[in-house]
Amino acid sequence: MGLEKSLILLPLLVLVFGWVQPSLGKETSAQKFERQHMDSTGSSSSPTYCNQMMKRRNMTQGYCKPVNTFVHKPLANVQAVCSQKNVTCKNGNSNCYKSHSALPITDCRLKGNSKYPNCDYQTNQLQKHIIVACEGSPFVPVHFDASV
């Protein structure tokens, strides 16, 4: 009798772990935003900042992400942008918000002659307003739309 129960339970456990396990390693849109765009430790004047950060934040795996922006403020400051000026996103959606003030950012752009796996980025330190798309409950940034 015990063997019959274990033969029934084993396939059920396999099914449950098959459903649960993939979701455990999947990051949310908000977590992805934080990984790709937040660096509150402050900007670096190093010309290799973008090369280091793009690699460290897994944006050079399989291909070189062409453009990325890092914001050098605490996450709470960037989350607060979601309650600031509502603007239209580049894709036409209406869930974008523009910061009231310019923020310290680093703009990373793939150099023209750079090819995977040797991703080489131009690092530019700037002070600009940011535009982010926000979603969810709590309402948080999920996409970096632009800097202006």
Swiss-Prot record:
Glycosylated residues (UniProt): N58, N86
Disulfide bonds, paired cysteine numbers: C50-C108, C64-C119, C82-C134, C89-C96
Summary of the function given for this chain in its UniProt record: Endonuclease that catalyzes the cleavage of RNA on the 3' side of pyrimidine nucleotides. Acts on single-stranded and double-stranded RNA.
Keywords, ordered alphabetically: Disulfide bond, Endonuclease, Glycoprotein, Hydrolase, Lyase, Nuclease, Secreted, Signal
Cellular compartments per GO CC: extracellular region
Region forming the signal peptide: 1-25
Reactions it catalyzes: an [RNA] containing cytidine + H2O = an [RNA]-3'-cytidine-3'-phosphate + a 5'-hydroxy-ribonucleotide-3'-[RNA]; an [RNA] containing uridine + H2O = an [RNA]-3'-uridine-3'-phosphate + a 5'-hydroxy-ribonucleotide-3'-[RNA]
GO MF terms, alphabetically ordered: lyase activity; nucleic acid binding; ribonuclease A activity
GO biological process, alphabetically ordered: defense response to Gram-positive bacterium
Residues forming the catalytic site: H37, H143
Classification via SUPFAM superfamilies: RNase A-like (SSF54076)
Source species of the chain: Myodes glareolus
Main location: secreted
Residues involved in substrate binding: K32, R35, K65, P66, V67, N68, T69, K90, R109
Highest taxon of source: Eukaryota
Compartments reported by the entry: Secreted
Expressing tissues: Pancreas.
Protein name (database record): Ribonuclease pancreatic
InterPro entries given in the database record: RNaseA (IPR001427), RNaseA-like_dom_sf (IPR036816), RNaseA_AS (IPR023411), RNaseA_domain (IPR023412)
Protein EC: 4.6.1.18
Family classification: Belongs to the pancreatic ribonuclease family.
Top-rank EC class of the record's enzyme: lyase
Subunit structure: Monomer. Interacts with and forms tight 1:1 complexes with RNH1. Dimerization of two such complexes may occur. Interaction with RNH1 inhibits this protein.
UniProt keyword Transferase present: no
Pfam (any one): RnaseA
Gene transcribed to yield this protein: RNASE1
